[in-house]
Amino acid sequence: MLKNVNFLSAKLSVHKYHSILCVTITLIMNWAVAVSQVPFQINIEKQAIKEKSKFNNASRSNSDDNNIDVTYYMCRWNVNPEIRFISGSVGIYYKYSEQYSGTVQFDCSDALIVDSILHAGNLISFSHVDNQISMSIEGNNTGAVDSCNIYYHGVPESSGFGSFVTDTTSIGNPCMWTLSQPFGAKDWWPCKQSLSDKADSIDIIVRVPIGNYVASNGLLISEDTVDTELVAHWRHRYPIATYLIAIAVSNYERYSEMLPLTTGNLLVQNYAYPEDRGDWEWLSFNTNQAIQYYDSLLIPYPFMREKYGHAQFGWGGGMEHQTMSFMADIGSWLMSHELSHQWFGNYITCGSWRDIWLNESFATYFTGLFYERFSDGFFPIWKDLQREYIMSEPGGKVLVDDTTTVDSIFNPRLTYSKGAAVLQMLRKTIGDEVFFEGLRSYLKDTSLASCFAYTSDFIYHMEFVSNRDLTQFFTQWLETEGYPILNIEWAQLKNNLNLRITQTHSVSGIELFSFVYPISLFNNGMETIKWLEINSSDQYIELELPFSIDSIKTDRNVDFLVKTIITQINVIGKNSLLIYPNPGNSNFTLKSLRKLESKGVKMFNCIGQEVQFNSILSQDGFTLAIETELLSNGIYIFQVNTMDEVYDTIRFIAN
């Protein structure tokens, strides 16, 4: 799910630039990416505020997850987009579990009125208290299949994102939609509102006033006219989480096409408001590109027998309802995020709030992959924006320890951005081929498919495919606060590049990280990349080079969540000494790329007389703080013997 606050301005830009940018397909593509990209941290922050509101206002499931296993819903609803009201029935089929206690429970808001419940063709007594329907049904065996039909009506409550919303379009036409993630389904229909139980299939039959159309999950089986109403029948035959079941109603204009994918042709449907249909249809090529790309990069689209679609709605963002995302617009930023949720979030759903990154970080990262594939040169900019946003604060980790704190669960900087950055670092650490094969292995796991997963499941597949122990990688980047800071001092001595690298951390008291890190060496415009093993708080690296270096840069492709400070040391002699301030007078700092010892440093004036001074050697042995009496103007020489018995001198000017 994404909250996009700038979709209206993007839509206006369509009209402004359409005639100019229709010159070539390439220009159209670049424009479509550009107008849909707003500063991602703004989008994600607004989205997180909505997520927090939703989490605060919506109560969790009351039903006993261990009592029954829901297998099927038959939903029959009567709605009118001009009236906030719903009536109908829900048939629920389920299996009894070993833990069945004699009571069947479903979630249903107290704002809804339950008229009656049929069980085995007979009316059954029930209680409806504290947003929960309870029925006593005795004498059933483990695994036995049973069902009931709940008849109800009422004015749905509004919680979280609204749950059940009636509104008007930009030109005043009535519209309604539902948005249940994660605990709003009970506000408008009786169900088992669970994050651990997916129904195997559903049928949805909706009656609406003629002139409206209904968008929902799965395939549209039929549309019939009965008196003054349209009756739409949608059928979905894949396991689905309760919060992903949805309907949207308005005077939609509809268009569709068959899109060739790796395993056949996929139906792609779009339900757009008439006033926006032109913009939507013009931007549809973005959707087609993304579906084909993800389908070939990962595993085939998970709901291939049915469809993928978009239904326009009035909430300023998007929601990844299974096979039919509800969208404010279909610009590339929003579209690619919601589409990728069909693999990461719908097909495989995170099993706990601690692991929410398996949904949101992955969808965020796949937006970046869309830019990498289709917007030449924008992916590094996108990564740099991500990194800048993550580093705007020093602390924070991806996995959530306190799942009762909404600020922790829905932190946009961490749940979305930092998690996406971790995926990019993993990709660069184990290599592209292994990384994407690991994603495919994860998605192909039959124990996770159409079910729920935890971070440990993802790690298992990445370790299996890479044949590497990635414990340290994931512990550092997912479970540890903050990020490393590297101070790199360098000097070239003939054919050797001498590097002194000190590592600190954005959060004090954190154990230092170990990781590989790229450094770019430049010579007359030519770039050579070396990979460094960073594994201590203070290390000295010497690289043999056959050329002179003009400059160095680190992580040129913006792949690592590491802050660096680079300093070139002016080399005098073979040992690369630096003294500053130079010129100076009485207090100096002497630095070396090799370890020093106080007794090995002597100071002489221009006629060879030794000058006495006081000094303090740093704990790491590379820096000597020097204090002298006020010096006469002139040239002085420091003579240095380092711990590895290398002799060198450096000149100093006093003034």
Predicted feature descriptions by range:
Residues S325-I381:
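Zinc-dependent metallopeptidase catalytic helix centered on the HExxH motif
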Residues V38-Q41, S109-T169, E542-P546:
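A surface-exposed beta-strand-loop module
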Residues D65, T142, Y151-D203, V558-N582:
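Glycine/proline-rich low-complexity spacer/linker segments in large multi-domain proteins
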Residues E360-T429, T446-A449:
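Acidic/His/Gly-enriched intrinsically disordered linker/tail segments
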